[in-house]
């Protein structure tokens, strides 16, 4: 029976939509700085920096203390639990520092992927236990949005019906719990770029996965205006012999979204999925210039694609902090322009052109 039991009050809905709109205001996107402690090792070890709490704090500090140029192109920052409770050198909590700049604070709330028995190496995401209490606490501590990542992969046998259904359901349950606590959920069903599949296959799988997600969100009475979607762009697999143009990637991506994502959704914040910094900006720009009608904000939620050059410039040396912050700002501004279809690429030179692909990427 389709009886309606109101899940949210008008005030709650208004607050959620307002938060979502602030994050994806024109020319703004998200800095994903929510790498787990283990993932930070993969960032710091290659540049010769020990993965300690203090080094992680110093690194995040150089991102968060970037000058006012950041405020024009970053609408939200996703924190990891540890970072939410860290402070800058002057004693200001990072969360307060970001909030005071008019940037929305977010928090990663999932607890990582676990194997889904009976599938060929597929996964589901854990973290629903105690999520409501954690969300209530995070809201008190300054967070207004959250992120939960589900992972699907393309192969002969996957994604299976089971993996699609289970991940859609867990994302919807998470989204519902967030909204009850005044937190805007970012729904992230990432289809990994591993494999030799072509653009068509990725588009087809992306459509099936997104359709399942929005069916589940509807079943769970999630208020779509108070959500954001964080999908992969539609690209061929990394081992695909055929190379596709930025325009082809944009057309396949926007077509998949138009077929599955309701216009009520406030914004789509793409993940970079191991693309190089430059590639992630060029593709986002092409998506915004795609000649199809696009009812949502189409912007970025990038981790590596905003940070790779900054990390290389920093190398853990205090004297390099300024240069590292400049590299971060350069990418942030590039993506702010790309989110408006106004980015002009300066070529694929240097570290910005280096692929950031990691096979079977786990955060």
From Swiss-Prot:
Entry EC number(s): 4.1.2.13
Matches recorded under CDD domains: FBP_aldolase_I_a
Gene behind this protein: aldoc
Name by which UniProt lists this protein: Fructose-bisphosphate aldolase C
Assembly notes: Homotetramer.
Gene Ontology biological process terms, A to Z: fructose 1,6-bisphosphate metabolic process; glycolytic process
Organism: Carassius auratus
Tissue: Expressed in brain but not in liver or muscle.
Keyword field contains Lyase: yes
Primary enzyme class: lyase
Annotated catalytic residues: 230
């Amino acid at each position: 029976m389709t009886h309606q039991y109101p899940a949210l009050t008008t005030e709650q809905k208004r607050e959620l939509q307002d938060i979502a709109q602030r994050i994806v205001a024109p020319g703004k996107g998200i800095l994903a700085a929510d790498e787990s402690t283990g993932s930070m090792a993969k960032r710091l070890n290659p540049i010769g920096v020990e993965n300690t709490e203090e080094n992680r704090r110093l690194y995040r500090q150089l991102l968060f203390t970037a000058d006012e140029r950041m405020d024009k192109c970053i609408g939200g920052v996703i924190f990891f639990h540890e970072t939410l409770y860290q402070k800058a050198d002057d004693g200001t909590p990072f969360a307060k520092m970001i909030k005071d700049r008019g940037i929305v604070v977010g928090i990663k709330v999932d607890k990582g992927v676990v194997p889904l028995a009976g599938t060929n190496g597929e996964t589901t995401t854990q973290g629903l236990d105690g999520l409501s209490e954690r969300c209530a606490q995070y809201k008190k501590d300054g967070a207004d949005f959250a992120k939960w990542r589900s992972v699907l992969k393309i192969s002969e046998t996957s994604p299976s019906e089971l993996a699609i259904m289970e991940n859609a359901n867990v994302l919807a349950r998470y989204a519902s719990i967030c909204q009850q606590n005044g937190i805007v959920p970012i729904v992230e069903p990432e289809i990994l770029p591993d494999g030799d599949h072509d653009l068509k296959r990725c588009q087809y799988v992306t459509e099936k996965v997104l359709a399942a997600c929005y069916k589940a969100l509807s079943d769970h009475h999630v208020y779509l205006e108070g959500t954001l979607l964080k999908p992969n762009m539609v690209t061929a697999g990394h081992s695909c012999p055929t190379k596709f143009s930025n325009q082809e990637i944009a057309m396949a991506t926007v077509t998949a979204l138009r077929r599955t994502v309701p216009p009520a959704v406030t914004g789509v914040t793409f993940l970079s999925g191991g693309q190089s910094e430059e590639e992630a900006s060029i593709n986002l720009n092409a998506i915004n210039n795609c000649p199809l009608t696009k009812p949502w904000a189409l912007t970025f939620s990038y981790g590596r694609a905003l940070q790779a050059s900054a990390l290389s410039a920093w190398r853990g040396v205090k004297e390099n902090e300024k240069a590292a912050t400049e590299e971060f700002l350069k990418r942030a501004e590039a993506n702010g322009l790309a989110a408006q279809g106004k980015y002009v690429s300066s070529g694929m030179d240097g570290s910005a052109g280096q692929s950031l692909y990691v096979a079977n990427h786990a955060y």
